Amino acid sequence: MGTAKKEQQRRIREGNTKDGNLRVKGENFYRDGKRVKFLNMYKGGKSIRNAKGDLIRAAPLQSTDVPTARVQPDRRWFGNTRVISQDALQHFRDALGDKKNDSYQVLLRRNKLPMSLLEEKDTSESPTAKIIDTEPYGATFGPKAQRKKPRVAAASLEDLAKATDSDSQKYEEKKELDSTLGLMAATEQEDGWSQVAKEAIFHKGQSKRIWNELYKVIDSSDVVIHVLDARDPLGTRCKSVEEYMKKETPHKHLIYVLNKCDLVPTWLAAAWVKHLSKDRPTLAFHASITNSFGKGSLIQLLRQFSQLHKDRQQISVGFIGYPNTGKSSIINTLRKKKVCQVAPIPGETKVWQYITLMKRIFLIDCPGIVPPSAKDTEEDILFRGVVRVEHVSHPEQYIPAVLRRCKRHHLERTYEISGWADATEFIEMLARKQGRLLKGGEPDETGVAKQVLNDFNRGKIPWFVSPPDRDPQPETSKRPADSEPETAQEAPEPPANKRLRV
């Protein structure tokens, strides 16, 4: 008896009919047994039929025989959504309510949570909130109904027509505002007063094109960086955009970057960081390709956001804010080269732009936006760098406001003049010192005023606004909460040894 037959008989006696260590036919040095079986599947994958064409042996994946199976009797198989008990839902709702308004707490895996059940809607102002209390169902429908006809707010058909026209007009206005995210609202405020007509130049940054660019940036960003001017952070803060994001996109992260901190004292930058950190994470920054400040802290913060969203292939970071606050300069600083066009004038960035920072982090540059407000005067808009000074008519009328906002010794040190009594004398002295005279020896007031305004906006003249919670005044002279904070002329300087902490 051959060796193969002896081995086969031994396996039969031991009850082991498996192949064991027998090699597959065709297995050699170049192909292992797994590869040979894989190739045999292609070769022998045809079905076998008899002379009549009936199927005798089906090819792989051709058989229609369904094996007997049993479905697990679990309620999750028979529901179209995930299920959760009311106790667990209430417990999670209480835990979420404690951390909901904390900007330093991040909710992960939001898509797997029933956010519509966790967020309780306020129905106190809804007209149908208390309809069951005023008109019970049993007294309205059924055999005990007492209402003869539906109650209508209008007393007559004419009143109903007027109400319909009013609602239609409000709907058209809302439809027009929706294209600008609802931010270009009417200029009339809650206190009932409105601002007088302004020049067309002071409405820059409020067009529909700008709002469309802002909408695209917010919609495409996972993290939104609000760039503020360190000299006047509250003036360059877009509160209406923040309210919109809080209401419509609560899952997006919003942080503040206090740019141009090199133009203010160190103690002031630290005070503003402490004040703004109560609302959002805030960083002090100085945009410069060669000598920057805060670059490492910002990159580290962006990497933390990237680690929080490991389930995504990449995250996008959008930069928004007032014109000429340094959004494009911050992007150039992070990339350490010029990838965005920058200029010391507002409106240089026209459309949004995608820039790659690293493999998983992308940056989005946005044009500057100016949320309309009736309380903003022409001086406020001009001093925030929203408009170009050369397009302003009669720029000398804004020089008195410059003298009020700046300290006298700063102006004397910048222009090397002294002894002026008012704005007119200041312009005349500066024009004669620089030799800017017209025919007849008259000073060029318009040209000198434009120069002073440009120096004011570009940081050549030191000025700043102190935080509102610094050095509170007595109760008798306390200003309202919505008033303008004190200027540099009123703010006392603390000791110079106070260092900035980011």
UniProtKB/Swiss-Prot annotation:
Keywords assigned by UniProt, alphabetized: GTP-binding, Nucleotide-binding, Nucleus, Ribosome biogenesis
Superkingdom of origin: Eukaryota
Domain CP-type G as annotated: residue spans: 211-372
Residues that bind GTP: G321, Y322, P323, N324, T325, G326, K327, S328, D365, C366, P367, G368, I369
Nucleotide-binding is among the record's keywords: yes
Keyword Nucleus included in the entry's annotation: yes
Region annotation (Disordered) ranges: 1-20, 459-502
A GO molecular-function annotation: GTP binding
One of the record's GO cellular component terms: nucleolus
Location in or out of the cell: Nucleus, Nucleolus
Composition skew (Basic and acidic residues), residue ranges: 468-482
GO terms (BP aspect): ribosome biogenesis
Family: Belongs to the TRAFAC class YlqF/YawG GTPase family. NOG2 subfamily.
PANTHER family the record matches: GTP-BINDING PROTEIN-RELATED, NUCLEOLAR GTP-BINDING PROTEIN 2
Functional summary from the UniProt entry: GTPase that associates with pre-60S ribosomal subunits in the nucleolus and is required for their nuclear export and maturation.
Protein name: Nucleolar GTP-binding protein 2
